[in-house]
Amino acid sequence: MPSFDIVSEIDTVELRNAVDNSNRELSTRFDFRNVQASFELVEQTVKVSAEGDFQLKQMRDILRGHLAKRGVDANSMDAKTAEQTGKNWHQDIVFLQGIETPMAKKIVKLIKDAKLKVQASIQGDKVRVTGKKRDDLQETIAAIRAAELGQPFQFNNFRD
């Protein structure tokens, strides 16, 4: 029986490249001249620091633009609240990976409500979908892409 997995992953190499490009752009921008501002990647978290709250917003927009250029979906960004220490502002941006159980249940419910002839099962941080026909699986992929679930999904491990 044909099957595929629904996962939510980001390419860490592309994430690192986007952070490096964002730092490079900060060094050349006129409005960030003589300002202490930087991006730092620690595992799946980008630590953003600047001298003002307004600059943090600009830096998030810079990062979002470079993520789009590198092919990383910005919907996986989860910006935490900004904190002020002294004259500097800091903010952590966490990149979500894996499908949490409530989101997996939403996906399974979405598939069942679409009345497609497929079965969906939650397996850890991914959802496996099996069906008798490849066309049913492709309709399932189209239905999930059409739904706005607030998280980017990839479809891999397609077996026939």
Swiss-Prot record:
The keyword RNA-binding does not apply. Coiled coil: none annotated. GO terms for cellular component: cytosol. Keywords: Nucleotide-binding. Pfam families: DUF520. Gene3D superfamilies: 3.30.70.860, YajQ-like, domain 2. Nucleotide-binding protein. Belongs to the YajQ family. PANTHER family: UPF0234 PROTEIN YAJQ. NCBIfam families: PRK05412.1. This is Nucleotide-binding protein VV1_2655. The lineage of its organism: Bacteria, Pseudomonadati, Pseudomonadota, Gammaproteobacteria, Vibrionales.
